[in-house]
A protein has these predicted regions:
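Catalytic-loop of the protein kinase fold
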Residues: 25-42
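Short C-lobe core helix of eukaryotic-like protein kinase catalytic domains
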Residues: 15-26
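Conserved structural core of kinase catalytic domains
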Residues: 1-12
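C-lobe/activation-segment region of protein kinase-like
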Residues: 46-170
Length: 170
């Protein structure tokens, strides 16, 4: 795959990334920190995932896993670090993190819908999905997920960890 502008095969790159994270998931590994800075191209222009410092074993999630993986909450923060933290994780995880930091689920959902690039720059303008629709779907998810309602974060992670890296790639 040639990474020069106009030559890059985005489809092939995405297939490769999804296969890579699918393989990791089958092995029980969640990277949990996927962003452009952690994807490098090797000498053959093959994408390689690096920096597994935040990775965890999805088959062994417990309270210690969560205690070592709480991320800095970045609502209202415009630093580059906060941008990646805010955008690379699934919105459901950001809601959980916000509740852990004292926000209500409703406030967190509103911050996410109006703050995450996927909603502002892709869902609404490209896909035509109104922000109100995205907000309602997140609210509905949060109201119907047993582990979310119970604030049982270990159960929440055990249920949803397999989607964490997929969200980051998407």
């Amino acid at each position: 795959s040639d990474i020069r502008p106009g030559k890059f095969d985005f489809y092939k790159f995405m297939v490769h990334m999804l296969e890579a994270t699918g393989t990791m998931m089958l092995a029980g590994v969640c990277h949990y920190d996927l962003h452009p800075g952690n994807i490098l191209m090797d000498q053959n222009n093959v994408a390689r995932i690096i920096d597994f410092g935040m990775a965890f074993d999805g088959h062994a999630i417990d309270k210690d896993t969560l205690d070592t993986h709480w991320k800095q909450l970045s609502f209202g923060d415009s630093t580059k670090n906060a941008h990646w933290i805010s955008n690379q994780e699934p919105p459901e995880v950001t809601i959980m993190n916000a509740i852990n930091h004292g926000y209500s689920a409703q406030d967190a959902i509103q911050q996410i819908i109006y703050g995450k690039d996927i909603f502002k720059q892709i869902a609404k303008p490209v896909l035509g999905i109104p922000l109100s629709s995205s907000m309602k779907k997140l609210e509905d998810f949060w109201k119907t997920s047993k582990s979310a309602k119970d604030k049982n974060w270990v159960s929440f992670w055990k249920s949803y960890w397999t989607a964490f890296d997929s969200w980051s790639i998407g």
